[in-house]
Amino acid sequence: MGVTPIKSVAEYKEKVTDATGPVVVDFHATWCGPCKAIAPALEKLSETHTGIQFYKVDVDELSEVAASNGVSAMPTFHFYKGGERNEEVKGANPAAIQAGVKAILE
């Protein structure tokens, strides 16, 4: 399935806040080393958990989305279920990301 980039505020609203199913959002930056390091693991998760929509938001391109979500460190992962944020993970922590995925599937 893969991790799909979100390119606009309207697209973020449509695909994340208006979503009815589980969603994972990776807030990242192109210059962020840990973001690049965790990207393959996130791709793998997206292929394993096909019932979850995986998106990524470049904080430099969509700074207003990052700010409105309280993102202050990269990478930050938000886990949504039914349009509500359930979990947040700051940093490239594979175990915590797995736990966030599990939480939105329950």
From Swiss-Prot:
Q: Which residues form the Thioredoxin domain?
A: 2-106
| Cystines in this chain | C32-C35
> What are the residue positions of the site described as Deprotonates C-terminal active site Cys?
D26
What are the alphabetically sorted keywords of the record?
Disulfide bond, Electron transport, Redox-active center, Transport
Identify which residues the record assigns to the active site: C32 (nucleophile), C35 (nucleophile)
Q: What GO MF terms are annotated?
A: protein-disulfide reductase activity
**Which PROSITE patterns does the entry link to?**
THIOREDOXIN_1 (PS00194), THIOREDOXIN_2 (PS51352)
User: Which residues does the UniProt site feature Contributes to redox potential value point to?
Assistant: G33, P34
Chain's role: Component of the thioredoxin-thioredoxin reductase system. Participates in various redox reactions through the reversible oxidation of its active center dithiol to a disulfide and catalyzes dithiol-disulfide exchange reactions.
Family the entry assigns:
Belongs to the thioredoxin family.
Report the protein name in the record: Thioredoxin
Instruction: Name its species.
Output: Penicillium chrysogenum
- The gene from which this protein is expressed is TRXA
